[in-house]
A protein has these predicted regions:
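Conserved beta-sheet core of the metallophosphoesterase superfamily
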Residues: 134, 138, 145-181
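Core catalytic region of metal-dependent phosphoesterases/phosphodiesterases
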Residues: 48-134
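Short beta-strand micro-motifs in enzyme catalytic cores
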Residues: 39, 115, 143-145
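Short, flexible, glycine/charge-rich loop motifs used to bind or transfer phosphoryl groups or to couple energy/partner
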Residues: 29-31, 56-57, 97, 134-135, ...
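Active-site neighborhood of phospho(di)ester-bond hydrolases with catalytic His/Asp-centered motifs
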Residues: 42-45, 66-71, 106-112, 146-148, ...
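N-terminal active-site segment of His-dependent metallophosphoesterases
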Residues: 1-88
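Flexible, charged surface loops at secondary-structure boundaries
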Residues: 33-36, 59-61, 100-101, 138-140, ...
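A structural micro-motif
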Residues: 38, 64, 104, 128, ...
Length: 181
């Protein structure tokens, strides 16, 4: 049988692990362990080389939800090279396995380098939600809008607006107190 994941308290109290962990956090290899039960982890434009770090981050942060705002396998540019669909599938499977191994909810929004038919087929028996266009969701009383680009969320903004794609529009709070992240 597979041993259970250590609790946050066990991670913090193990002296050897704590010392190694501290070194890894300082080196930027791991995020600090926190209790993220009420947290959303927003990611976007993830190259497959980032998947191992993403797995560690998810396990250590333990978010309630993961929202990916597109370009799931950003190192495979299907928009430019559609012949790489098999490679995209292979790398996408790694990401989907990573997400399905976790206990948090996940929303994936397609980006310009994603292939919706492949994504839908690969998630048909999964709890992962796939959105082909911008949308809204609520967590408690907090209203979120999520899309692949800033333009996807700016006109019909929620309290918290999640987007990726490029860095032309940095994180900001507008005059109405709405967050753009």
């Amino acid at each position: 049988p597979v041993p259970p994941e250590p609790t946050l308290e066990e991670i913090r109290n193990c002296p050897v692990r704590s010392r190694i962990d501290d070194i890894c956090v300082r080196a930027g290899l791991n995020p600090p362990p926190i209790d993220g039960r009420d947290m959303i982890l927003h990611i976007s434009d993830t190259p497959s080389t980032m998947f191992p770090y993403l797995r560690r981050a998810i396990r250590r942060l333990r978010p309630a939800w993961i929202v990916h705002t597109g370009d799931l396998v950003d190192d495979v540019k299907l928009e430019c090279r559609p012949g790489l669909l098999d490679l995209y599938r292979k790398k996408l499977r790694i990401l989907l396995n990573l997400l399905s191994d976790e206990t948090c909810g996940a929303i994936l929004i397609t980006g310009n380098h994603d292939h919706l038919p492949t994504l839908l087929k690969m998630t048909e028996n999964s709890t992962v939600q796939v959105w082909s266009r911008p949308g809204r969701f609520y967590i408690g009383s907090f209203r979120f809008r999520a899309g692949h680009t800033y333009e996807d969320v700016m006109n019909d903004a929620g309290e918290y607006n999640l987007f990726g794609h490029n860095m032309e529009h940095p994180t900001a709070i507008d005059a109405y107190g709405r967050f753009f992240l």
